[in-house]
């Protein structure tokens, strides 16, 4: 210890640089580990990651000559693959996530993260409601212009979560009625994060008539007693049909 103190007194500048550099390196490694843990561990609102299987964006082409290749799956395609999986407890389809101009009026707003989801999304992810409710089956099926927003947006626009319920909130200059307000979700959660959530059925009421190409993804929750590898095998069999 005396030798260390003597070295520090002899070379205070280099000793300080060495100590600070070591501290910064340790802090950097700890931050990376914390971010990795947050993005991979079973933490709310993505509290069942270890039981989830995620689709990729998909890739389609003509079988005859491999021409007309496209990335991305339509609702029709993703539903055909994931709808009848015996090993899946729940499947949620995620529409495209966009940055859109949003605000409490057409002339007052800013770009926000808008996520398009179905009803099962709220069963797969644990996002607590602060006020109001989630959009209903009837609203989803009827393509109603309803939206669930985060608590921060509600406070900024209307003063409180409770005051936001029933008000109009403009998404891409189109009014949508606020039916619910959730707790804010950190952007570290890849699939649960959003500032606004709306039914993807409001984007296109004729989803079943499209072709293979689109912007949908799927997240499947594995049934108890079924392994993730088994569910992946079922997905591959479904693709082969």
Per-region residue spans from a language model:
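A short amphipathic helical element positioned immediately N-terminal to and/or at the very start
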Residues: 1-9, 77-81
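Alpha-helical hydrophobic/aromatic positions enriched in membrane-embedded helices and signal peptides
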Residues: 3, 10, 17, 110, ...
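Alpha-solenoid HEAT/Armadillo repeat architecture
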Residues: 9-10, 221
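Mid-to-C-terminal secondary-structure elements
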Residues: 118-135, 145-241
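Short, strongly hydrophobic transmembrane alpha-helices
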Residues: 11-39
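Structured, solvent-exposed hinge/loop segments at the ends of secondary-structure elements
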Residues: 33-157, 163, 171-176, 233
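Amphipathic alpha-helical recognition patches that constitute DNA-binding helices
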Residues: 3, 27, 31, 217, ...
């Amino acid at each position: 210890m005396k030798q260390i103190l003597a070295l520090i007194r002899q070379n205070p500048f280099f000793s300080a640089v060495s100590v600070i550099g070591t501290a910064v390196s340790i802090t950097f490694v700890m931050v990376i580990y914390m971010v990795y843990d947050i993005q991979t561990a079973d933490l709310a609102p993505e509290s069942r990651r270890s039981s989830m299987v995620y689709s990729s964006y998909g890739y389609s082409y003509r079988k005859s000559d491999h021409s007309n290749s496209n990335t991305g799956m339509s609702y029709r395609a993703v539903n055909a693959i994931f709808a009848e999986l015996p090993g899946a407890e729940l499947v949620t389809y995620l529409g495209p996530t966009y940055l859109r101009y949003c605000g409490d009026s057409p002339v007052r707003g800013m770009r926000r993260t808008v996520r398009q989801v179905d009803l099962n999304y709220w069963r797969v992810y644990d996002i607590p409601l602060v006020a109001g409710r989630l959009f209903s089956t009837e609203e989803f099926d009827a393509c109603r212009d309803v939206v669930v927003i985060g608590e921060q947006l509600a406070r900024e626009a209307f003063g409180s979560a409770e005051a936001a319920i029933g008000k109009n909130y403009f998404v891409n200059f189109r009014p949508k009625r606020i039916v619910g307000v959730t707790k804010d979700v950190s952007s570290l959660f890849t699939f649960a994060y959003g500032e606004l959530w709306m039914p993807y059925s409001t984007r296109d009421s004729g989803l079943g008539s499209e072709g293979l190409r689109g912007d949908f993804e799927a997240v499947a929750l594995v049934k108890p007693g079924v392994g993730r590898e088994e569910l992946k095998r079922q997905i591959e069999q479904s693709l082969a049909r």
